[in-house]
Swiss-Prot record:
Domain notes: The cysteine framework is III (CC-C-C-CC). Classified in the M-2 branch, since 2 residues stand between the fourth and the fifth cysteine residues.
Compartment annotation: Secreted
Name under which the protein is recorded: Conotoxin TsMMSK-B021
Family named by the database record: Belongs to the conotoxin M superfamily.
Propeptide positions: 21-50
Record bears the keyword Secreted: yes
C-alpha cells in the first residue's frame, strides 16, 4: 500500500512540480483599484501637479501626499 502511495506521489510531483506554484513573495503588490482600471495618477481629479502627488482619497490615487 505504501509503495502505491509513493508511486502516486511521484507521478503527481512530476506532473505538477512545486516550482510551478508561485509563492506570496513572488506576487506583485495587490492593489485592486489599480488592477480594475488603466491607472494614471496624473488623470485623477485629486492629483496635485505641483506637488506630484494626490491630495485626497489615497485609497484610489497613488502616490499620496503627506499631510
Amino acid at each position: 500500500m505504501m509503495s502505491k502511495l509513493g508511486v502516486l506521489l511521484t507521478i503527481c510531483l512530476l506532473l505538477f512540480p512545486l516550482t510551478a506554484v508561485q509563492l506570496d513573495g513572488d506576487q506583485p503588490a495587490d492593489l485592486p483599484e489599480l488592477r480594475a482600471q488603466d491607472f494614471a495618477p496624473e488623470r485623477s481629479p485629486w492629483f496635485d501637479p505641483v506637488r506630484r502627488c494626490c491630495s485626497q482619497d489615497c485609497r484610489v490615487c497613488i502616490p499620496c501626499c503627506p499631510n
